[in-house]
Amino acid sequence: MMKKLKASEIRQKYLDFFVEKGHMVEPSAPLVPIDDDTLLWINSGVATLKKYFDGRETPKKPRIVNSQKAIRTNDIENVGFTARHHTFFEMLGNFSIGDYFKQEAIEFAWEFLTSDKWMGMEPDKLYVTIHPEDMEAYNIWHKDIGLEESRIIRIEGNFWDIGEGPSGPNTEIFYDRGEAYGQDDPAEEMYPGGENERYLEVWNLVFSEFNHNKDHSYTPLPNKNIDTGMGLERMASVSQNVRTNYETDLFMPIMNEIEKVSGKQYLVNNEQDVAFKVIADHIRTIAFAISDGALPANEGRGYVLRRLLRRAVRFSQTLGINEPFMYKLVDIVADIMEPYYPNVKEKADFIKRVIKSEEERFHETLEDGLAILNELIKKAKATTNEINGKDAFKLYDTYGFPIELTEEIAVQAGLKVDMTTFESEMQQQRDRARQARQNSQSMQVQSEVLKNITSASTFVGYDTATAQTTLTHLIYNGEEVSQVEAGETVYFMLTETPFYAISGGQVADTGIVYNDNFEIAVSEVTKAPNGQNLHKGVVQFGQVNVGATVSAEVNQNDRRDIQKNHSATHLLHAALKSVLGDHVNQAGSLVEADRLRFDFSHFGPMTNDEIDQVERLVNEEIWKGIDVNIQEMDIASAKEMGAMALFGEKYGDVVRVVNMAPFSIELCGGIHVRNTSEIGLFKIVSESGTGAGVRRIEALTGKAAFLYLEDIQEKFNTMKSQLKVKSDDQVVDKLTQLQDEEKALLKQLEQRDKEITSLKMGNIEDQVEEINGYKVLVTEVDVPNAKAIRSTMDDFKSKLQDTIIILASNVDDKVSMVATVPKSLTNNVKAGDLIKQMAPIVGGKGGGRPDMAQGGGTQPENISKSLSFIKDYIKNL
C-alpha cells in the first residue's frame, strides 16, 4: 500500500534512492540564474545542468540527482483557479550524461514508485504514455517491467523538442486516483494523458538521443542523455491522498494562518478558495525569490515579483484583509521549507521588510487603478458605451486590476467591456512568454572535439608567471590538427600553464608562448569541458607543432594589477556587508587590469555617506598591511572558519580559501596579492543601478586610483583659479555665495516677468467670463520660459480664487498650457480633463490632478483654436 509521506520525506527518499544508484546530488541552485542571460528564472530541474548536456563542462559523475526550486510565471492568471498550477515549485530529477539510457531510467522509476522501501505505490494504479514510434520504450515497459499493453498509451506529443539542441522521445507515468475523480470516458479526455483530475502525471522521463540541427534535421547524439522530472507538490498530493496540491503539508500551514488573519475558512467557498490559493502560492514565490537575490522593481524579474505581490494583496481584499499582512506569512514558509532550504529563514527579517514596504505601496496603486477606470467609464459613456479592450488590458497588466472587477464596475455603470480585444492582448502576452520560454531553454549542440580531449593540463599560475612546458593539442577551425602556420588564430593546450583562465569574474591572463621556432600571442584563456585551460592566440611567426617544448610567459604588469583589483574586490564585498547589511550578495563582478566592477543585491541607491564609509573601510584594511593567506581545505572546515561562499556558486569537496582575516575570508579560485598593502589605494568612481534590485560599483586601485585622484585635483585647482580663491576651504564658501546670488537674481527676474505679464494682460478680473454657470479665464499669456507660466498661474489664482483658469503660451515654438479648477468645483469639472481635451489640438498631450493639470504641444499656431475649443467644451458640460 502506498505510504503517506510528508513532502520533505518524499524529497529525501528520492535523493537517497538515486544516491544508492550511483548518482551525485547536485544542490539546488538559486532561482536567479548564474551566468545564463537567456533565463529570467531557473524554471526547471535541467535548467542548471545545461552546461553538462551541451558539452561545455563534464560533471564529476555522469549520474546526477537534484531537487531544484523553480519559478514559472507564464500562466499567472491560472494560479488559484486550478488544483495544480503554481508559480513556485520543486522539481525532483535524475539525469544521465552519456551514461545509462532508457532501460535503466525506466527500471529506476518503476522501482522507486512501486517498491515498499520507497513510495510503495500499487502497480495496478500506474499507466504510462510513450511516443508511437518508440518501440524500445514500449518493449521495456511491456516485456521487462511487465506492464500490460492496455496500460501503455501511445501519444504523438510525447517528443521533447525545444528547438536547436538535444531532443528526443519521452515517457510519462500516470497515477490513477480512482473513480471518485471521474468515470473513464474518451470523449471527456478521461484517460492517461488527457486533461482530467483522475489520471495524474507524476513523472516525465525524457530520452535525449537526437540533435535538432539548424536546418531542422535530426542526427543521433554521440552521447545519449536522460532528463527526468517529478513535481514534488503533485507527488505529495498523491502520497497524502488529497484533492489538490494546496491541501498538502507544503501549503496547509499557510492556509491556517490566512484563516486566522481573515476570519474566513478554507475549503468552504470556491470563490474564497481562489484567494487562499493565490496568496499561498505567491508568498512562496516571493519569499524564495527575494532570498535568492531578486527584489521588486518595474522591469525584468523584479517586475514579476511586484506583479505577484499585487495580485496576492488584491485577492486578500476579497477575504476582507485591507492592510499589509503578506509579510507575516514569511516565517511560516521558512519553517515549512527548512532544513533543505535554510536561506529563507536566515534572511526572513530582510524578506519581511521588503514585502511589507511593497504591500504599503500597493494600496496607492490600487487607488490609481480605480481612478483610471472611472476615467475610462466617462470616456465610454461619451462614445461607444464600451470600455476599450486595450485600456482594460493595460489596467490589468500595469496596475494588476482584475478584469472581472473591471467588468463588474462597467456593468454597474451600464457599460460593457470589449473582451475580444482584451483576450487578444492577453493571448499576445502569453505567446510572447511562450516564445521567450522556448528560446531560453534551447541548448547548444554538443562540441565533441574538446569533449574528447581528456589529457591533463595543470595550472601552475598561483606560484609563478612563467613555465617551461609542452604544447599538447592544437585546434584550428574547429578541428584538432598537428601544426599551424604564422598569422592564424589557434586554440591550444599545455601540460602545465601559468595562464589563468577567465573565471569568477577575473579576466584571463595574456602573454606569449614561444620557442626558437615560433611565437603565439595569447589573448584569451577559458576552461575546456574537461577542465583544462584552453588558450587562444595568434601565431606571430613560425610554424607551431604539437609536442613542441615551449616557454609560457604571462604579462606580469597586467597580472599584478589584476591581483590588486581581485583582492580589493574581496575587501569591497566585506565592506558592503558591514555598511549595508547581510542581505548584500554578489550578483556579478569583473576584475580587469585597469579597474574592477562589482554588482551586488541592494534595494536602493547608496547614499554618499555609505559610499564614503565603504571606501574608508577598504582603505583601512589596505593600510593595515594584512597578510593574505591562501589555503586549500574541505568545504566543512572552510565554513567552520567563517569563509564566505559566493551566492549561487557551486563548490567541490575541496575549496580554496582566501583569508584576509578578520575582515574578509572568502572562497575563491582567483589570483591575489600577498599582503593587502600591495593594493596601495582604493577609490570608488561610480555607484549605479543595473536593473531590478542590483547596484553596481566601479572602482580603481593602486596607480590607477592615484592618477584618477590626480586628475580630480587638477580640475579642482582650475576651479580655484576661476573662482579666484586661494585656499581649498574657500571653494565651498565661494560656491555657496554664488548660488545665493543666483537665487536672488532669479527671484528678481521672476518678479519682473510677472509684472511685465501683468502689465500686458491688464486687469484680469475684466477678462473673466461666465460659461455654463462657471467663472472662467481662458487666455494666452506672453511669458519668457515654460516655468514662468506656472508662476503666472499662481499669481492669477491668488486673485481669482473661485475661477477656472486655463493659460497657454508659446515659448520657442513650443506650447505650454496649465489649468486649475477650484476644489469646490472638481466634482463637476476636472483640470486633467480640460488639458487632455486641449493638448491634442496643439499636437501634444497632458494631464494631472482634478484641481491642477498641465500639458504641452508642438503646434503653437493652434493655440487660439484650442482655447476656443475648451470654452465650448465647458459650455457643454
Curated annotation (Swiss-Prot):
Binding-site positions, Zn(2+): 566, 570, 668, 672
Recorded catalytic activity of this chain's protein: tRNA(Ala) + L-alanine + ATP = L-alanyl-tRNA(Ala) + AMP + diphosphate
Annotated Gene Ontology cellular component terms: cytosol
Gene3D superfamilies: 2.40.30.130, 3.10.310.40, 3.30.54.20, Bira Bifunctional Protein, Domain 2, Threonyl-trna Synthetase, Chain A, domain 2
Record EC number: 6.1.1.7
InterPro entries, A to Z: aa-tRNA-synth_II/BPL/LPL, Ala-tRNA-lgiase_IIc, Ala-tRNA-ligase_IIc_anticod-bd, Ala-tRNA-synth_IIc_core, Ala-tRNA-synth_IIc_N, Ala-tRNA_ligase, Ala_tRNA_ligase_euk/bac, DHHA1_dom
Single annotated GO MF: aminoacyl-tRNA deacylase activity
Cofactor annotation remark: Binds 1 zinc ion per subunit.
PROSITE patterns cross-referenced by the UniProt entry: AA_TRNA_LIGASE_II_ALA
GO biological process, one term: alanyl-tRNA aminoacylation
Main subcellular location of this protein, as a coarse class: cytoplasm
NCBIfam families the record matches: alaS
Domain notes: Consists of three domains; the N-terminal catalytic domain, the editing domain and the C-terminal C-Ala domain. The editing domain removes incorrectly charged amino acids, while the C-Ala domain, along with tRNA(Ala), serves as a bridge to cooperatively bring together the editing and aminoacylation centers thus stimulating deacylation of misacylated tRNAs.
Family per record: Belongs to the class-II aminoacyl-tRNA synthetase family.
Name of protein: Alanine--tRNA ligase
Lineage: Bacteria, Bacillati, Bacillota, Bacilli, Bacillales
